[in-house]
Amino acid sequence: MSIMSYNGGAVMAMKGKNCVAIAADRRFGIQAQMVTTDFQKIFPMGDRLYIGLAGLATDVQTVAQRLKFRLNLYELKEGRQIKPYTLMSMVANLLYEKRFGPYYTEPVIAGLDPKTFKPFICSLDLIGCPMVTDDFVVSGTCAEQMYGMCESLWEPNMDPDHLFETISQAMLNAVDRDAVSGMGVIVHIIEKDKITTRTLKARMD
């Protein structure tokens, strides 16, 4: 069994027209044993910037804390909000530093540029190799199912409501086909003037 699937979990981000969405499941378990259904996997890293972490639960929390520390230092030194691309470099550095004994988590970043409001999504592997795309990124135990749903449902230039419907359907249907993720989904829709957070009910088995 892979250490990446020990706790299970699924994270996904999608790009729309002047907006992005990031979603994650709510389950925290130890293999087949379920522990809690309100585990946080998406963390705010700025006003319009979020990171989702799928993988080993201890490393999810460790990486989130260490990243927040580095982010606070950056904002104190620079006196401005971090750009999504810069956050990606920061995460890549954090992961690559520990490449010989890595953090077992594969991050997904979604957000808008603080000045231009240009949408940005990317994913990284567990040693910090980034992949920036213009459609969607996925991470977690049901990555294959999420890719299948996203490739079927995603369209370019979706408005926020259409984007929410698409990412919700993709996420709910993907986690239904994975035994170690699910138990509800949380979705953040990031727009220029607001962030909408919705919690979706899913199968509880």
Curated annotation (Swiss-Prot):
Q: Which residues carry this modification: N6-acetyllysine?
A: 77
The question of whether Cytoplasm is a record keyword is answered with yes
Q: Which GO biological process annotations does it have? A: proteasome-mediated ubiquitin-dependent protein catabolic process
Its function, per the record, reads: Non-catalytic component of the 20S core proteasome complex involved in the proteolytic degradation of most intracellular proteins. This complex plays numerous essential roles within the cell by associating with different regulatory particles. Associated with two 19S regulatory particles, forms the 26S proteasome and thus participates in the ATP-dependent degradation of ubiquitinated proteins.
Keyword list (alphabetical) reads:
Acetylation, Cytoplasm, Host-virus interaction, Nucleus, Proteasome
The UniProt gene name for this protein comes to PSMB3
Subunit description? The 26S proteasome consists of a 20S proteasome core and two 19S regulatory subunits. The 20S proteasome core is a barrel-shaped complex made of 28 subunits that are arranged in four stacked rings. The two outer rings are each formed by seven alpha subunits, and the two inner rings are formed by seven beta subunits. The proteolytic activity is exerted by three beta-subunits PSMB5, PSMB6 and PSMB7.
Q: What induces it?
A: Up-regulated in asthenozoospermic sperm.
Q: Where, subcellularly, is it found?
A: Cytoplasm; Nucleus
Where are the membrane-spanning stretches? none
* One Pfam family recorded for the sequence: Proteasome
Family membership noted in the UniProt record: Belongs to the peptidase T1B family.
Entry protein name: Proteasome subunit beta type-3
GO CC annotation terms, alphabetical = cytoplasm; cytosol; extracellular exosome; nucleoplasm; nucleus; proteasome complex; proteasome core complex; proteasome core complex, beta-subunit complex
Top-level taxonomy: Eukaryota, Metazoa, Chordata, Craniata, Vertebrata
Q: Residues bearing N-acetylserine?
A: 2
